[in-house]
Amino acid sequence: DNQYGHAYGNAIIPDTYTIDLTGFCMPTPSTKITSPFGPRWRRMHNGLDLKVNIGDTIVAAFDGKVRIVKYERRGYGKYVVIRHDNGLETIYGHLSKQLVEENQLVKAGEVIGLGGNTGRSTGSHLHFETRFLGIAINPIYMFDFPKQDIVADTYTFRKTKGVRSAGSHDTQVA
């Protein structure tokens, strides 16, 4: 977690919101998840880690606008945050090199950086995070990494408890 990844402040979180996932592009050809989303050690791991080699090409998951290009020595290392028209933001962490600038428009599949091992990292990988209004959502609820595809054309964000189904997941909001 960092101050730059939460730009929505006091935004009102809707009870439900349908996110269009069409137009998605896998951020890397890698299908190997080396660390899943969820509690880890004494903190929450708000994304998942995909195995990449240093220098591997990392691409934008959707069309969007680059919001942040920064370096955090004890966090994401060199990272990029992209805001997308579908309501999501994606975060790409531990890059060896960032190849975009803040406010730059990017297309899905466009190269945004190179795989790396910067910041708080134990080996070369891509930390990939998906957020809606600053709330981290497990990427596997939207994307099937082994198949390199989306789970469904849409994902329904729900902030209240209920029944889970393909393409939706209940997210607890503090």
What do the predicted segments below correspond to?
Residues 47, 94, 125-129:
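Histidine-centered divalent metal-coordination motifs
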Residues 50, 79-82, 107-119:
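Short hydrophobic beta/alpha edge segments that flank linear recognition/processing sites
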Residues 74-81, 124-126:
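Short aromatic-glycine-enriched beta-strand elements
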Residues 36, 69-70, 98, 115-118:
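Residue-level recognition of beta-strand microenvironments
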Residues 37-38, 78-91:
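Short, basic/aromatic beta-hairpin or loop at an interaction surface
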Residues 53, 69, 86-109:
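Short histidine-centered loop motifs in beta-beta connectors
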Residues 101, 110, 129-174:
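Acidic, glycine-rich catalytic/binding loops that coordinate metals and/or anionic ligands
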Residues 1-77, 108, 158, 164-174:
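Surface-exposed, glycine-biased beta-strand/turn segments
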